[in-house]
Regions:
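Conserved beta-strand/short-helix segments
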Residues: 1-301
Length: 301
């Protein structure tokens, strides 16, 4: 397993829930387990084999069967390592329920990506307890963000960001710890930014119409991070200062040893949400790979 997080109410039963990632489950396809909270008087001691997690309506009719918790799992395709990182996404689609953000760094030839699984009252009525991540958009259960280029490992680290743009919906962070950036900003044919494995962190703004959006060549609810900051995908991109900084993650090739992105809350008391971005291999003041952390203040009215 990778990490576990508490969630707000994902299935609209008035209780907080849990999410646990297992990127090596199912022979490396990976899985993300969402475990529903239960009232105290219904909790009994015991061990839960997490792969046996089930929804209440699908449990055995055998009265001797013991259910410690109900829940559901999101599963990846072979080799995707779904569940490398996960977090509470807040209310990303403005429906009043909590959502879950899950990273999948080896998705689509290691471009990587992340999924947002929308909370819903109807979850308990589903007839299956394993849902393929690829089916989220077509079933109206969530959306997928895809990395830009092969080897970017987008989704190696993900984090809920709170409401950065102050529009009433929460936002998310997705790190791509192996991405290189080459940009000609003024169109003169000369690269203004040329940084190998500097890494980028994408800030994606939440919105109520996310499932109807699509970037060119994709189905609705499936968006390429190449379009960040456009009308297709409102948000922003943070770029590592130097080659090899690994902004947002690092050390392990899939960023599996650091948690380099996080919400900082309102750190300066201005009523706006701030961000923390770590660059584990940055070399400040000639200190080789000492690392840096950037505190980015929230903007807007």
């Amino acid at each position: 397993m990778s990490n576990a997080k508490g969630l707000r109410d994902f299935n609209a039963d008035g209780l907080v829930d849990l999410v646990i990632g297992a990127p090596l489950a199912h022979q490396g396809a990976g899985a993300c387990y969402i475990i529903f909270g239960r009232p105290r008087d219904m909790i009994m001691g015991g061990e839960l084999q997490i792969e046996e997690l089930s929804l209440g309506m699908n449990v055995s009719d055998d009265p001797r069967a013991v259910r410690i918790f109900d829940g559901i799992q999101l599963v990846g395709a072979p080799g995707e390592r779904l569940g490398q990182s996960q977090d509470d996404a807040g209310d990303f689609n403005a429906d009043g329920l909590g959502d879950v953000l899950i990273g999948s760094p080896l998705l689509n030839n290691r471009k990587g990506g992340a999924a947002v699984f929308f909370g819903a009252r109807e979850i308990a009525s589903l007839t299956q307890t394993e849902i393929p991540m690829a089916e989220l958009p077509s079933r109206g259960l969530g959306m997928i963000f895809e990395g830009q280029d092969d080897g970017d490992f987008a989704g190696a680290r993900v984090a809920g960001a709170g409401d950065i743009d102050r529009d009433g919906t929460t936002d998310i962070l997705i790190a791509a710890p192996n991405r290189s950036v080459r940009l000609d900003l003024d169109g003169d044919g000369v690269l203004d930014i040329d940084r190998t494995e500097c890494c980028v962190v994408y800030l994606v703004y939440g919105a109520p119409d996310l499932l109807t959006r699509a970037t060119p060549g994709n189905e609705p609810g499936r968006l390429s991070l190449a379009y960040i900051g456009t009308t297709y995908l409102p948000g922003a991109m943070f770029i590592g200062r130097n080659s090899g900084d690994h902004l947002g993650a690092g050390l392990g090739i899939q960023g599996d040893r650091t948690f380099g992105i996080a919400s900082a809350g309102d750190s300066n008391g201005d009523g706006k949400r701030d961000l923390l971005l770590g660059a584990v291999d940055a070399s400040p003041r000639d200190r080789a790979k000492a690392g840096e952390v950037y505190l980015i203040y929230g903007q807007g009215e």
